[in-house]
Amino acid sequence: MSFNTFGRVFTFTTWGESHGPALGATVDGCPPGVALDEGWIQQFLDRRRPGSSKFTTQRQEPDRVRILSGVFEGRTTGTPIQLMIENTDQRSKDYGEIAQAFRPGHADIAYHLKYGIRDYRGGGRSSARETAARVAAGGVAQAVLRDLVPGLKIAGYMVQMGDLHLDRANFDLAEIGNNPFFLPDAGAVPAWEDYLNAIRKAQDSVGAAVEVLIQGCPPGLGAPVYAKLDTDLAAAMMSINAVKGVEIGEGMAAAALTGTANADEIRMGNEGPRFLSNHAGGILGGISTGQDIVVRFAVKPTSSILTPRRTINRKGEEIELITKGRHDPCVGIRAVPIAEAMAACVVLDHLLLDRAQTGGRRGTIG
C-alpha cells in the first residue's frame, strides 16, 4: 500500500493499524529551532481522544504521544520527527464475526477487492484510529505556525448534526471547548445532547457537518493551477474517514446566487484592500486573500450500528450482520480536531512552499 504521505514541503507519513501495538507519524520538512515537546502535542490529541464523553466511542485510549526523534533539548533539529502512540484498549474479539464478512458502509469490501487481504480487526488501516497520528502531526504544524504566523488561529466546530443546525445568530467561538460537540452555541447544547441520546438509544447513528475557520492567514498562499490552496484543503478534508463532501465559502449554495450577490466587492482601507463580504471563503484563484478561510464538510453516519444489515461474505453468500464493537454514534464530533490538524498541515505546507517559490515577495497596491 502506497500513498500514506501527505504534503509537499512539510510532510507526514502515518503508519499503524487500529488493533496493532502502536501507530504514529513520521514528520519531515519541519524547520529547525522550533520549541516542541510531548505536552504541546498532547493537548491536541486529548481533544480527539476516544472515550472522552458518552457521545463518542467508549474505547479507552490514553493516546499518550512519544517523540522518538527530531527534537533535542526541547527544539526541533530539522531532521525527521518520529511520533508514536501505543494502542492499549483493543478488543479484537469483537470483530471475529466479520473476518469473513463485509460490513455494509465500511471499507472492508473495497480493501478486499483491491488487495485480496485485509486486517479486519477494527478496520485495520481504514479505521479512524489512524487519525490520531494525523492529529499528532498537526500538533507539530501548529507549533511551527505559532512561531511563523503568531496571529493565525484555526478553529473547527460542528454546524449540523442530523436535523439540527447551528443558529449563527448565537455564534460564539469561545464556547467550542466547553461542550462535547465543539458547538459554538452554549444554548443549543441541551437540545443536541437530547437528540444524540435518542439516536444512541435507537442503536443508530447520525451524520454531521463540520466547519473549519482559519483566521489570520496571510495573503498569497496557494500555487495555481494544480496546487491551489482550496484544492489541497478540500483534499485534506476528503481524506478524513466518512467525509463525503467539502465546500469552500458559500460552496454549493453559490449555485443559487447571482453574480451580483456572490462577488465580494473591494474597497481601499487604511491597511490595504478591504473586502465587503466573504462569499469566496478567503480564497480566490486558489490563493489566500487574507480574509478568513472557511471550509465546510459533510460526514456520513457511522456505518457500524446494531441494526441487522444485509451483506455478503467472502464465499459470496448472502447473510445478515450486526456490527459489534465500540463505535461513535456521530463521527462528526471527533472529526473536528482531525480537521483542525489537517488544516494546520496544509497551511504550513503552503507557507513553506510559498517562501521557496516567491521568497516572500508580494505585489503592492497604492
From Swiss-Prot:
SUPFAM superfamilies: Chorismate synthase, AroC
Cofactor: FMNH2
A cellular component term, taken from the record's GO annotations: cytosol
Residues noted as binding NADP(+) in the record, renumbered to the chain: R48
Any GO molecular function: chorismate synthase activity
Keyword flag Oxidoreductase: no
Pathway annotation from the record: Metabolic intermediate biosynthesis; chorismate biosynthesis; chorismate from D-erythrose 4-phosphate and phosphoenolpyruvate: step 7/7
Keywords: Amino-acid biosynthesis, Aromatic amino acid biosynthesis, FAD, Flavoprotein, FMN, Lyase, NADP
E.C. number(s) listed in UniProt: 4.2.3.5
GO biological process: amino acid biosynthetic process; aromatic amino acid family biosynthetic process; chorismate biosynthetic process
Cofactor note: Reduced FMN (FMNH(2)).
Binding site for FMN: R125, S126, S127, N241, A242, G285, K300, P301, T302, S303, S304, R326
Catalytic activity: 5-O-(1-carboxyvinyl)-3-phosphoshikimate = chorismate + phosphate
Membrane-spanning residues: none
NCBIfam families the UniProt entry points to: aroC, PRK05382.1
Family named by the database record: Belongs to the chorismate synthase family.
Assembly description: Homotetramer.
Known function: This reaction introduces a second double bond into the aromatic ring system.
Protein name: Chorismate synthase
Organism annotation: Paracoccus denitrificans (strain Pd 1222)
